[in-house]
Design a protein with these regions (language model features):
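AMP-dependent adenylate-forming
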Residues: 2-4, 19-193
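Adenylate-forming
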Residues: 3-11
Length: 193
């Protein structure tokens, strides 16, 4: 049996798990799964509202018995990450804001979506470049890839090493991603550092 575990150090190890099913296709990624019984794991949007609908990305937050007391002699980081639960105004209850982004899939399993501090804002949407790269990398014929945001020109650029034609790659990405997440420029390159 293989199990995918997720958990930052601040939770003193793991807070979610997913038992891999050998019959399932994990081409789109392996979920981080469901919380352990002693943890409550949930997603918050930018307005501190709980996210429950599938495919909506939010910050992964944790509360429970394994939550650390905080960072040693680092009050700034404590104030940013070990905070009062915004969903509970009735009594003191600390949560840990991981800075990780996640979403629920259609089966209700958590799926890691990247880091909050690598987000950009483009066409009115918050975008995780890693998410675009993950979808691009899953397309047949793509060996390596990266996505960059050109702030000066305000556009997304995708670079890839592989055998797939640009038009085929663009069409495949349009089937997997919303229009605002499709790089305006796709460039095939020989090598990538």
């Amino acid at each position: 049996m293989f199990v995918n575990l997720y958990g930052p150090t601040e939770i003193t190890c793991n807070c979610t798990y997913h038992i891999l099913n050998p019959e399932r296709d994990y081409a789109a990624g392996i979920p981080i799964g469901i919380p352990f019984p002693n943890e409550d794991v949930f997603l918050l949007d930018g307005e501190n509202r709980k996210i429950t609908e599938p495919e909506t990305v939010g910050e992964l937050c944790v509360r429970g018995t394994a939550l650390a007391l905080g960072y040693y002699r680092n009050p700034e980081q404590n104030a940013a990450h070990f905070v009062q639960n915004p969903l509970n105004p009735n009594y003191p209850e600390r949560i840990y804001r991981t800075g990780d982004l996640a979403r629920y899939d259609e089966a209700g399993l958590l799926v890691f979506s990247g880091r909050k501090d690598f987000q950009i804002k483009y066409m009115g949407h918050r975008i995780e470049l890693e998410e675009i790269e993950r979808e691009m990398a899953a397309i047949d014929g793509v060996e390596r890839c990266c996505c960059l945001f050109d702030e000066k020109r305000s556009r997304l650029k995708g670079f890839y090493v592989g055998t797939v034609e640009k038009e085929t790659l663009h069409a495949a990405m349009r089937r997997k991603l919303p229009e605002y997440m499709i790089p305006g420029i796709l460039r095939q390159v020989e090598t990538m550092p």
